[in-house]
Amino acid sequence: MILANDELKKLISTGRLKVDPLYPDTIRENGLDLRIGGEYAIYAYEGVVIKPCELESARHLFRVVKADEVVIPPRNFALLTTEEYVKMPDDVVGFANLRSTLARYGLVIPPTIVDAGFEGNITIEVVNETPNTIVLRRGMRFLHLVLAKTEGRAQYSGLYQGQRGVTPPKGLKNEC
């Protein structure tokens, strides 16, 4: 069941769902609009062969940029972080979607789940499918998070728990 704004307000007022900072326009009809944080990550190299199964960490492949503007080159992508630190209830899952206005400029994100029990800034991959450079601004609403109740409760203990700022991918060396 997708949670409407009245249910979201209840979860926030009881402290079960935390969104910090919480702006007047964060809570929408059927989800939360989240803002671009103060840093993003892009690949530091071009033409490199990346083998995730051989990496313990991929952080060295990325350059973290602290800026008020996010520059996404043509047919490239950037890892963006939310300004908001989010703490999800253990019985609510989030489905991240790019705001449709930004999608109309040619930006897309892959299907992204914010797990029940997750806590941290949310890192999202934003792909520029166009032949043009697209520049976004820190603080603009970019992500719409739809929340839904789960049957039962979850204990999230993933590597990204508690992440602050933009977080490049982990390596998959121990999973392949």
From Swiss-Prot:
Keywords: Hydrolase, Nucleotide metabolism, Nucleotide-binding
EC number(s) on file: 3.5.4.13
A UniProt-annotated Pfam family: DCD
Active site (UniProt): E125 (proton donor/acceptor)
Pathway as given in its UniProt record: Pyrimidine metabolism; dUMP biosynthesis; dUMP from dCTP (dUTP route): step 1/2
Any one GO molecular-function label of the UniProt entry: nucleotide binding
Keyword Transmembrane: no
Domain of life assignment: Archaea
Annotated GO biological process: dUMP biosynthetic process; dUTP biosynthetic process
Signal peptide: none
InterPro entries: dCTP_deaminase, dUTPase-like_sf, dUTPase_trimeric
Self-association and partners: Homotrimer.
Function recorded in the entry: Catalyzes the deamination of dCTP to dUTP.
Family, per entry: Belongs to the dCTP deaminase family.
Protein's recorded name: dCTP deaminase
Organism this protein belongs to: Pyrobaculum aerophilum (strain ATCC 51768 / DSM 7523 / JCM 9630 / CIP 104966 / NBRC 100827 / IM2)
